[in-house]
Amino acid sequence: MENLIALLIAAPLLGAVVLLCGGRRLDAVGHWIGTALAATSFVIGIVLFADMLGKNAEHRAISQYLFSWIPVGSFQADVSFQLDQLSMTFVLLITGVGSLIHLYSVGYMEHDERRRRFFGYLNLFLAAMLLLVLADNYLLLYVGWEGVGLASYLLIGFWQHKPSAATAAKKAFLVNRVGDMGLSIAIMVMFTTFGTFAFGPVFDSVGKTGEGKLTAIGLLLLLAACGKSAQVPLQSWLGDAMEGPTPVSALIHAATMVTAGVYLIVRSGAIFNAAPDAQLVVTVVGAVTLLFGAIVGCAKDDIKKALAGSTMSQIGYMVLAAGLGPIGYVFAIMHLVTHGFFKAGLFLGAGSVMHGMNDEVDMRKYGGLRTYMPVTFVTFGLGYLAIIGFPGLSGFFSKDKIIEAAFAKGGTEGWILGGAALLGAAITAFYMTRVMIMTFFGEKRWQPDTEGHEPHPHESPRSMTIPMIVLAFGSVFAGGLFSIGDSFVHWLEPVTGHSEGNSPVSALTVTLATMVLLVVGAGIAYAQYGRRPVPVVAPRGSLLTRAARRDLLQDDFNHVVLVRGGEHLTRSLVYVDHTLVDGVVNGTAASMGGLSGRLRKLQNGYARSYAVSMFGGAAILIAATLLMRAV
Amino acid sequence: MNPVNYLYLAALLFTIGATGVLIRRNAIVVFMCIELMLNACNLAFVAFSRMHGNLDGQIIAFFTMVVAAAEVVVGLAIIVSLFRSRHSASVDDASLMKL
Amino acid sequence: MSAQLAAYSTSTGEAFQFWVLGTVAVVGALCTVFMKKAVHSALCLAGTMIVLAVFYLANGAYFLGIVQIVVYTGAIMMLFLFVVMLVGVTAADSLKETIKGQRWLALVCGLGFGILLIAGIGNASIKDFNGLAKANANGNVEGLAALIFTKYVFAFEITGALLITAAVGAMVLTHRERTERAKTQRELSEQRVREGKHVPPLPAPGVYARHNAVDIAGLLPDGTPSELTVSKTLRERGQIRDVSTEALSDLKALEQRAEERLERTNSGEGSK
């Protein structure tokens, strides 16, 4: 069974190689090759999963050693994989949702002449992501980490003919570099501290290490997670990343890649458990981001950007949960999986809407689409109910648990974090209801585009609706399935550990409070957008709205602090360079030049002149000799 | 008379020769001045030989003569070919070292 | 002369010889430097060298003294004269300095160098002269030979190699490979006819009653000298003598003299 692990990665990698190197002759069948290989990986995942279920909880983790990658003295990097319950969860999510989105892309990218390349990139992404979650050491994880960064860059900028897409890809890449720097430094610190970076030995030696070092490693890992998972302060790239094709947004920027940060924190749980300060920072980052993303999501009129804000916010929940330690690890992953289902479904629904609306993304130009695309409406609606935490659906179980866990943290922190999570739930209800109403309810507001084509909303082809339906099933039932008898907790407990914590408020109270806030949030949204007609042109809005439209000024902040600061620093350095360094250099050169110009006159080309200097030199030598003798 | 006077004479002749090298432009005369300097050295060597009571100084002077002969042969050949190509025996005319 | 005396001083005869011949040598050296014509310089240098040869002999270097006369004065100086003739015997150098400050620098350096050198010798305070009586006991030439072929044999061999190299070098430098066959008289005359100039033989140099030399250009009908009449070598050296105005100035001088004489006779007649 162990030998199958490498095949998980090999299948999509083969697809990427074949599709990217195969050339035009594969144009006709490339998308099916890509989809088939993704599905192959999924089937292998299922087989491994079945095998794993058949074992005892203690013996479920298996590993595969492939080859020694960099054997240099004490620096031993192996290519070896580890498949435990945590990795298994991710494998199934990645390959499952990945296969569905491959299928969806077949329809969505039908008219794109570079579809083969698109599927090649998707397969490359799958391979890198699987490498990330299957690696049994941090260095190999880093390879996968960079691999998904590369795939993300390529896919965001897939429509590179659009300057906005190219810029967005660049931005995502650059912001991610900051986080990657954190991961690479964390690996270096680990190597100097522990002498290794394999998961097992590192976690085993955590107990023997000072807390300061662990906190440093934890914070560096958090920086990496912030970059990849779009958490404050490295969140600015995710909104722009929506320039990529919608399946990319669904797969990479909603369901899988952006959750890699959560995976990293949960995987490194042993380190974080021993570094409470780092954990606190993680929870703060999570809480801030969940509110930040939610507020941004409220103000965006671009459906994908609203969903991106929501993604940011939901990952904020997961990071918050992951920062809570053993109380929250399981729920972070559980929310990650359910979020993978419903957010992917929501994005696919958004893609379906755009597909029917001539790629219009402004929700103010939608309205009343429920009759035109019923399947999309139903699946999107189920996703909507799941994300706001409607009782019985996935989001209800997973998000409720996180809020409970936040309260269970105890003390003032628990109250603050729990309060933030509750508030986030209310805002989530508001912005998702807003998206729902503006898109599917109310009167038609669509307009002819610049070329005069009136959009003809229509239901998407089968290849697109089937994945949406499957994901809608996931959104509805996953949470309940995981929660029956705490099956998910028991499943992950051997890897991440679990503790109940002692919540100052009962689970029922939390649930009721959540319900109340949910109704309030949805009600406000209905009052604002359902009762009144939605203006086609966005009103000016309050200061907060305007700020939120500009992503709460994150780009402005980056511009002023980083870009301007960098510019000023550069300018002052250039000034110093021009005046001081160049002054010294040029001054030396000029004085040398002047001196040479004078000395040059001695070099008149007459042999007799040179002879005089020789003769004079000889005279001086005699004088020196005589002087030395005299002394 | 002290035989050291031979050394003073050699020094004087050497200096005259060197000054001649510096102020004359005709390559042949310059060359003759060099010969004068070599002869002054020879005189000094011979005087040294007498001073020390062995013949090594004379041997060195002998070798100097041989080398001087070789030098004259090559030097005059150079002057002749210079004269052939430049129609002048002035050392200043060969100031091609200057740009 | 006893050996004891030789150690500290020399005979009166040698002292006399030194002061007389030394003066001659210094004068010869100065003349070598300051004579305008290279030939004179060479002759003065030869004189100095002969004086030096005498000094060698006086210092007990009999072999070197003879070699100095035979090789240096006889062979090398003659080589110099030969080259001087080849390059142009009459080409007098102008002693005017062309490089600014060169003469002053040379004089300062020369003076400084000479004073320092002489001061150095004086400073060395050499007292005892061993004399060569013992070293020359078996004869000077034999003593030299014994040293050359034992102690200095490698230097001697290398000097031989140097001489051969120098001889070959001189030949390489002065030898000019003839790349084409020399033209015969017939071909030359045919070429002249083809080119249409100087069809007759080249004109002869000027022949005058008072001058008859190859370096005087013949005059053209208008009285200007024709360079064609002088040999190419002399032309290149710039050694053509222009006597075209001499005839007129001579005539003028003749007339003047005749007038003076006539006047004198006239005045003589008048006084009568």
UniProtKB/Swiss-Prot annotation, chain B:
Keyword list, A-Z: Cell membrane, Membrane, NAD, Quinone, Translocase, Transmembrane, Transmembrane helix, Transport
Membrane-spanning residues: 3-23, 28-48, 59-79
Positions of disulphide bridges: none
Topology with respect to the bilayer: Multi-pass membrane protein
GO molecular function: NADH:ubiquinone reductase (non-electrogenic) activity; quinone binding
Annotated InterPro entries: NADH_UbQ_OxRdtase_chain4L/K, NUOK/Mnh_C1-like
The keyword RNA-binding appears for this protein: no
NCBIfam families (UniProt xref): PRK05715.1-2, PRK05715.1-3, PRK05715.1-5
Stated name of the protein: NADH-quinone oxidoreductase subunit K 2
UniProt organism field: Streptomyces coelicolor (strain ATCC BAA-471 / A3(2) / M145)
